[in-house]
Amino acid sequence: MTQARRPLMLIIFDGWGYREAKEGNAVMTARTPNLDRLEKECPWCFLKASGEAVGLPKGMMGNSEVGHLTIGAGRIVNQDLTRINISIKNGDFFKNPVFLNAISNVKANASSLHLMGLASCGGIHSYMPHLHALLKLVQEKDLKKVYIHAFLDGRDEPPKAALGDIKKLDAFCKEHGNAKIATVSGRYYAMDRDKRWDRTKLAYDALTRGVAPYTAPNAETAVSNAYSRGETDEFVKPTIITEQVITEQVITEQAEKPVATVQDNDSVIFFNFRADRARQITWAFVKDDFDGFMREKRPEVYFVCMTQYDETLEVPIAFPPIKLENVLGEVLSKHGLIQLRIAETEKYAHVTYFLNGGEEKRYKDEDRCLIPSPKIATYDLKPEMSAYEITDEVIRRIQSGKYDVIVLNFANMDMVGHTGIFEAAVKAVEAVDKCIGRIVEVLKEKGGVALITADHGNAEEMIDLKTGEPHTAHTSNPVKCIYFGNSEIKALRNGKLCDVAPTILELLGIPKPQEMTGKSLLVKD
């Protein structure tokens, strides 16, 4: 009979940052008897989870993709944002053959170039200077028909930052060529990642058919009208920007038409660099066997992805992935360990794809468990999300005695934190606390151990103290790392997210591969 395994668990609280001040701090406000007890009884430390510690520009907040990638890699990896910034600075961006091919296609067909993506300075899914660089490039190449399809943020920026962003973008367009904003749409629609295809279809139809819930004479008015309807940036319904129809210098009775829609032979550059929320609308454009919704129109276009969104798609990629060798999952597999990755829908890609170095592949003896996220409009309506279901399932898996290593993500503090609803975020923290209490009790019975940490901050800063408005973005605050288990380990040193994987390997008695430059957090006597 095979001896039952005593698992090592890596438990990631998405959005669990540390901030001393209690005002606007859902983590400090919540009743968390289990976490309080763990922090009192167990060794713990702080980890840097933002900026240069995770391969981002100095001072930039972390995010889930970057956090999980860094945790799994065991090293600091220059993130796509940083890679693209460097290419702009050294000029390689403007010589990128994929961009140049898209421009050549437009010139050869006398067609249009469409630049679509999140028009945000947040730096999580996209970065406004990248769009600016594209506009400078097309100005240099003297393209006449250039259109922007602006997705609005409201999560990685304040809920009403888009109006100012759009004004600045409009001014930049006037200074650098003649690009026009053709549509605006909240990311809730254009960047859904949970196969809520009705949302994606609204954005897709706006881009391809010029059909949307609303129209406006310009992008600034589109955003202002949305605010008047009670919509914040994330939830702005797709809106077509229209222009008056002039025939023989006379304005016709029909009065207006869309500024532009995506047509056959056009080029499209999707300038988001983060994959998870770029996939669905990309699939709608490029997949022959797409079945998410009925496409009334499917234009044949030259479609460029800024980075690799889906390795199964044969599309041009401006910045292809850099392969990471010997990430945590690979090392565990090579040593014959059986591992489990478990999360709900919102963070499933993070404990699989991103933790595995940005690759879809599943390693030998790597089991995966997806718990569906609740089908609701916003997670403040159900702050516990699917945490209780995840906990029930992971306890069952622990008790099975099958696994050596279990990686679990609780999405609550991040996803509810993004809503900006303080009371809901407090409930989210309390739900996770109940879950961790149950899990560590079972681990204790089985002789298991756990590292409990986070990928970035969020719920600890729910109010912008300068404006008094809800704070919906991530933070650059440090995160905690708690060790639960073997009493021989007395202390952890402060470190970075890249130190988590080397710590796990030391706990398992596995040599750290040379590619991992992070260092174990365990303090030796």
UniProtKB/Swiss-Prot annotation:
Keyword Metal-binding recorded: yes
GO molecular function, one term: manganese ion binding
Binding site residues for substrate: 125, 155-156, 187, 193, 274-277, 347
Transmembrane segments: none
One Pfam family this sequence matches: Metalloenzyme
Coiled-coil stretches noted in the UniProt entry, renumbered to this chain: none
Enzyme Commission number(s): 5.4.2.12
Keyword Manganese carried by entry: yes
UniProt-annotated catalytic positions: 64 (phosphoserine intermediate)
Reaction(s) this enzyme catalyzes, per UniProt: (2R)-2-phosphoglycerate = (2R)-3-phosphoglycerate
Cited InterPro entries: Alkaline_phosphatase_core_sf, BPG-indep_PGM_N, Metalloenzyme, PGAM_B_sf, Pgm_bpd_ind
GO biological process entries: glucose catabolic process; glycolytic process
Function according to Swiss-Prot or TrEMBL: Catalyzes the interconversion of 2-phosphoglycerate and 3-phosphoglycerate.
Name listed for the protein in its UniProt record: 2,3-bisphosphoglycerate-independent phosphoglycerate mutase 2
Gene that this sequence comes from: gpmI2
